[in-house]
Curated annotation (Swiss-Prot):
Gene field: Cdh2
Presence of keyword Transmembrane helix: yes
Alphabetically ordered keywords of this record: Calcium, Cell adhesion, Cell junction, Cell membrane, Cleavage on pair of basic residues, Glycoprotein, Membrane, Metal-binding, Phosphoprotein, Repeat, Signal, Transmembrane, Transmembrane helix
Low complexity: compositionally biased ranges: 863-880
A cellular-component GO term for this protein: plasma membrane
Sequence positions that bind Ca(2+) 1: E170, D226, E228, D262
Record's function text: Calcium-dependent cell adhesion protein; preferentially mediates homotypic cell-cell adhesion by dimerization with a CDH2 chain from another cell. Cadherins may thus contribute to the sorting of heterogeneous cell types. Acts as a regulator of neural stem cells quiescence by mediating anchorage of neural stem cells to ependymocytes in the adult subependymal zone: upon cleavage by MMP24, CDH2-mediated anchorage is affected, leading to modulate neural stem cell quiescence.
Membrane topology summary: Single-pass type I membrane protein
InterPro entries tied to this protein: Cadherin, Cadherin-like_dom, Cadherin-like_sf, Cadherin_CS, Cadherin_pro_dom, Cadherin_Y-type_LIR, Catenin-bd_sf
Biological classification of the source: Eukaryota, Metazoa, Chordata, Craniata, Vertebrata
Tissue: Expressed in cardiac muscle (at protein level).
Glycan-linked positions: N190, N273, N325, N402, N572, N651, N692
Residues in compartment: Extracellular: 160-724
Post-translational modification: Cleaved by MMP24. Ectodomain cleavage leads to the generation of a soluble 90 kDa N-terminal soluble fragment and a 45 kDa membrane-bound C-terminal fragment 1 (CTF1), which is further cleaved by gamma-secretase into a 35 kDa. Cleavage in neural stem cells by MMP24 affects CDH2-mediated anchorage of neural stem cells to ependymocytes in the adult subependymal zone, leading to modulate neural stem cell quiescence.
Name the UniProt record assigns to this protein: Cadherin-2
Length: 906
């Protein structure tokens, strides 16, 4: 049929509202589903529709739930929906022969969930109208009429239609291309037009899904659609003439892909894990499982429902859990969850679309694993009512007893972990109970020393609890309390001194043999008959001794407060007390002697060395006194000069500045520079006072205008100490030893040079009597000889006719030899290097000395040797028959040869 895009609603005739709702009864009880029970509502109306006229009624099922649903029409300008689902006409308009299509939306006000249903309104046919077109006829979409000029004025066109969308189901089986609508312009009667469509699905990706016949305007789809990929296509239709000029304004064409139930629900996880505490009441939330469906969630195809297919194990009830069919929330519906009996439940969950319709809906399953978590519903119970243990006295951190308990709760959880406490029998807190994290046992431990002589046994009352309180309604049984009997074992303890340290006050200077005090040690083992012996452990100055039996301490030397072993007037000595127990034990005690000072040290001058100028002005010497005693046996001091020698008071004068300082000055106008020893009498304030003549070494020197000595040497340089003298002597001795070693080394070096040979042994050295022999050639260059001269010895010329160039190099030249300077005498054997260098220089300057860079010709000795080889040259007699004594006459060069053959029997 024809859909006029530009036709106004006022042209639709009003027909009586006739609702045709057909629901096929299948004989089965359908499951309740929320939403519209029908996919499409249709009504046949009269030609004229009046404002406020009820047209039809749409039903909405909320499955007995009090949903507040609000209705809305896709064409609010023409239709409205009342709260009860009645559809009214907003205005009056004639209903045309074509169908009027629109959508009705229902939305939950609370959850914002939305449903929709299609409504088709058709006009009741009349006798004068053409019969209805066949169903296979294609719907047309006509371009709206344009504004046109008429009699020089513009005419307004009537309000255009908003073209309803085209609904096209997904997964259509064709055949393809499948015709949808025909797009046409009213101007095709006068012009030759060309039609085209643009937009995604046509000329934009994905391209080629929709095509249009450019001449007829037939719009077709070329392949099945998938709503899950693209749910809506928005195309634009164009009409141009054959020259490409736009004839009509483009119109929008919306193609909705209608969802089909082609996707099964998919769970987000195949295995869901949840937990619930044991003993939970019915209605306790456990977990939520969720599945999704790729189909339209606002249609039945995407509306899921959940249910539990099975539960394992089925104890104590086969229906311990239930699931909300819409949300997937799993809750408990029965009591009796006990982890000690069933620790885990496995549920098979099914999700079905089509609102759970088992006939038409698609389903999928997942597994829900529910773990029953432990609660503290089982208190710990001791395995015995009384536990026993023992501990040696004075021992700490010792495990006395091991307490064992049983707990049926899950191990290593707060409901199983035991916490022990001592409820009685330990008022002073000498014991503590630790928990073994692995075995959950209680370890009774001693944390404070126990004295056998005070407590021989303890009876403790202990209680066992958990780290978390017991579940509501659970009480601790009597087995959660036990008794621990601890026996204390007597051991040999250390003797001890009281008080320790012991402090006494004594004057220094006590003579040896003076009894100071008695140290007495006590043995805490009252029930053991033991003897104590005393020994000295520490006595830094070795002043004391102790009686081994009674502990009496006596001096063996004079006590001196000024000793370096006395710190802050206190002398410390340590003594040891040992018993004869098994094993023997010992204890230490300290004696502190506070030494009172006596005036036993005379004062000394300080400093002991000073310097002054030769004249009284401009400086003087400030002195003080050093006294190792303390007040009142020290200062104030009195300073004076002795009467003898008389030069002291003649040259010097001393003035007391205060009780601790005095000033020494020159009394005469000039004193020659030098070192002077000035005796000074110093008296302290002790009772009786103690005096001392102390020597002050004064260096008198020449001074500059500032009163400073111009001498470089200090007073210490006036004399050498013993150490300096020893150092100087050692340096002198070391220097002498080095010189002596150098002389010995030089002499030995000279001897080695005399004994060293140049080319031969020292005994063969004949440089004092040089012998000259004929030389047969030079160095390497004379080895390059002519083999032909050796192979043809007959061609050798006589000496008289030999050319000069081929004479033997070892022959003396015939002409007069040039005179060369006579070589100097051989140098001393110690300077072998100089001797070799001089000989080399002389040989280089001698033109007659071989070798020459020339051919060497040797004398011809005849041919035809009777000896075929060197081995054939054998003496007619043995070596013993020959006399080699003549070798001794050949000189030192043949001495070795003479020794070899003339050595007699050797």
């Amino acid at each position: 049929m024809c859909r006029i895009a530009g036709a106004p609603r006022t042209l639709l005739p009003l027909l009586a509202a006739l609702l045709q709702a057909s629901v096929e009864a299948s004989g089965e009880i359908a499951l309740c589903k929320t939403g519209f029970p029908e996919d499409v509502y249709s009504a046949v109306l009269p030609k004229d529709v009046h404002e406020g006229q009820p047209l039809l009624n749409v039903k909405f099922s909320n499955c007995n739930r009090k949903r507040k649903v609000q209705y809305e029409s896709s064409e609010p300008a023409d239709f409205k929906v009342d709260e009860d689902g009645t559809v009214y006409a907003v205005r009056s308009f004639p209903l045309t022969a074509e169908q009027a299509k629109f959508l009705i939306y229902a939305q939950d006000k609370e959850t914002q969930e939305k449903w929709q249903v299609a409504v088709n309104l058709s006009r009741e046919p009349t006798l004068t109208e053409e019969p209805m077109k066949e169903p296979h006829e294609i719907e047309e979409i006509v371009f709206p009429r344009q504004l046109a000029k008429h009699s020089g004025a513009l005419q307004r066109q009537k309000r255009d239609w908003v073209i309803p969308p085209i609904n096209l189901p997904e997964n259509s089986r064709g055949p393809f291309p499948q015709e949808l609508v025909r797009i046409r312009s009213d101007r095709d009667k006068n012009l030759s037009l060309r039609y085209s469509v643009t937009g995604p699905g046509a000329d934009q990706p994905p391209t080629g899904i929709f095509i249009i016949n450019p001449i007829s305007g037939q719009l077709s789809v070329t392949k099945p659609l998938d709503r899950e990929l693209i749910a809506r296509f928005h195309l634009r239709a164009h009409a141009v003439d054959i020259n490409g000029n736009q004839v009509e304004n483009p119109i929008d064409i919306v193609i909705n892909v209608i969802d089909m139930n082609d996707n099964r629900p998919e769970f987000l996880h195949q295995v869901w894990n949840g937990s619930v505490p044991e003993g939970s009441k019915p209605g306790t939330y456990v977990m939520t499982v969720t599945a999704i469906d790729a189909d339209d969630p606002n249609a039945l195809n995407g509306m899921l429902r959940y249910r539990i297919l099975s539960q394992a194990p089925s104890t104590p009830s086969p229906n311990m859990f239930t699931i909300n069919n819409e949300t997937g929330d799993i809750i408990t519906v029965a009591a009796g969850l006990d982890r000690e009996k069933v620790q885990q439940y496995t549920l098979i969950i099914q999700a079905t679309d089509m609102e759970g319709n088992p006939t038409y809906g698609l389903s999928n399953t997942a597994t829900a694993v529910i773990t029953v978590t432990d609660v503290n519903d089982n208190p710990p119970e001791f395995t015995a009512m009384t536990f026993y243990g023992e501990v040696p006295e004075n021992r700490v951190d010792v495990i006395v007893a091991n307490l064992t308990v049983t707990d049926k709760d899950q191990p290593h959880t707060p409901a199983w972990n035991a916490a022990y406490r001592i409820s009685g029998g330990d008022p002073t807190g000498r014991f503590a109970i630790l928990t073994d994290p692995n075995s959950n046992d209680g370890l009774v431990t001693v944390v404070k020393p126990i004295d056998f002589e005070t407590n021989r046994m303890f009876v403790l009352t202990v209680a066992a609890e958990n780290q978390v309180p017991l579940a509501k309604g659970i009480q601790h049984p009597p087995q959660s309390t036990a008794t621990v009997s601890v026996t204390v074992i007597d051991v040999n303890e250390n003797p001890y001194f009281a008080p320790n340290p012991k402090i006494i006050r004594q004057e220094e200077g006590l003579h040896a043999g003076t009894m100071l005090t008695t140290l007495t040690a006590q043995d805490p083992d009252r029930y053991m008959q033991q003897n104590i012996r005393y020994t000295k452990l520490s006595d830094p100055a070795n002043w004391l001794k102790i009686d081994p039996v009674n502990g009496q301490i006596t001096t063996i030397a004079v006590l001196d407060r000024e000793s370096p072993n006395v710190k802050n007037n206190i002398y410390n000595a340590t003594f040891l007390a040992s018993d004869n127990g098994i094993p023997p034990m010992s204890g230490t005690g300290t004696l502190q002697i506070y030494l009172l000072d006596i005036n036993d040290n005379a004062p000394q001058v300080l400093p002991q060395e000073a310097e002054t100028c030769e004249t009284p002005e401009p400086n003087s010497i400030n002195i003080t006194a050093l006294d190792y005693d303390i007040d009142p046996n020290a200062g104030p001091f009195a300073f004076d000069l002795p009467l003898s020698p008389v030069t002291i008071k003649r040259n010097w004068t001393i003035n007391r500045l205060n009780g601790d300082f005095a000033q020494l000055n020159l009394k005469i106008k000039f004193l020659e520079a030098g070192i002077y020893e000035v005796p000074i009498i110093i008296t302290d304030s002790g009772n009786p006072p103690k005096s001392n003549i102390s020597i002050l070494r004064v260096k008198v020197c020449q001074c500059d205008s500032n009163g400073d000595c111009t001498d470089v040497d200090r007073i210490v340089g006036a004399g050498l100490g013993t150490g300096a003298i020893i150092a100087i002597l050692l340096c002198i001795i070391i220097l002498l030893i080095l010189v002596l070693m150098f002389v010995v080394w030089m002499k030995r070096r000279d001897k080695e040079r005399q004994a060293k040979q140049l080319l031969i042994d020292p005994e063969d050295d004949v440089r004092d009597n040089i012998l000259k022999y004929d030389e047969e050639g030079g160095g390497e260059e004379d080895q390059d000889y002519d083999l032909s001269q050796l192979q043809q010895p007959d061609t050798v010329e006589p000496d008289a006719i030999k050319p000069v160039g081929i004479r033997r190099l070892d022959e003396r030249p015939i002409h007069a030899e040039p005179q060369y300077p006579v070589r100097s005498a051989a140098p001393h054997p110690g300077d072998i290097g100089d001797f070799i260098n001089e000989g080399l220089k002389a040989a280089d300057n001698d033109p007659t000395a071989p070798p020459y860079d020339s051919l060497l010709v040797f004398d011809y000795e005849g041919s035809g040797s009777t000896a075929g080889s060197l081995s054939s040259l054998n003496s007619s007699s043995s070596g013993g028959d020959q006399d080699y004594d003549y070798l001794n006459d050949w000189g030192p060069r043949f001495k070795k040869l003479a020794d070899m053959y003339g050595g007699g029997d050797d």
